[in-house]
Amino acid sequence: MSGADANLARIPEGISDEVAVYCADMLSTGFMGAEHGNIPIGGTVAVLAQGPVGLMATAGARLRGAGLVIGVESVPSRQKLARFYGADVLVDFGKEDVVERIHELTGGQGVDTAIEALGADVTFQTAVKVTKPGGTISVIGYFGQGEFVHIPRVEWGVGMADKTIATGLCPGGRLRMERLLRVLENERVDPTRMTTHRFPFSRMERAFEVSDKKLEDTVKVLVSFDE
């Protein structure tokens, strides 16, 4: 990888490889969602989808001082993890109207920050709809399908609601890695709760299958090279 040495950071004593490896993507991308979200102290945040990146965005929102963190998720095991990482309220999109429920939770105002962590057009539209005027939609999902991503015109304030849309790619660099490791060293967050499956290197193919097909209620798969 070109420039890989620019991302080298010393892993502090006491931090396991399993903990540290989360800095490479999930932790950095999820926290970026909170950072780009301009979350005010005591602000309201909705994190749409509680996969690994969304869970770290939830943790990041709590660390940034959000007063109310709303997690949107339908899978019970991920709802439980969302609670662990800082979601105050869970909204199950399979059972209730997400937009209506979030407006109810925020007194009809909408949230200061909506973090889109799935990468789907419908989720992005929901993020725009639940964000208050002057708020921020922070996008950390990967939109790998479809020709367009649609902005709902009315909820966008017909272009006049001053809703900021922020996007980004997993940030790296030595200083970034050192900051993330400091968060882990001081036990601000424990990403290993997301590790649902462990495989030896000899079973790499099965590890990829479980991860790709989301088998056995998987969240994150760890492959060990200790053989």
Protein language model regions, located:
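Glycine- and other small-residue-rich loops at beta-strand/loop junctions that grip anionic moieties
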Residues: 19, 46-50, 71-72, 91, ...
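C-terminal hydrophobic helical "lid"/dimerization subdomain
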Residues: 125-129, 173-227
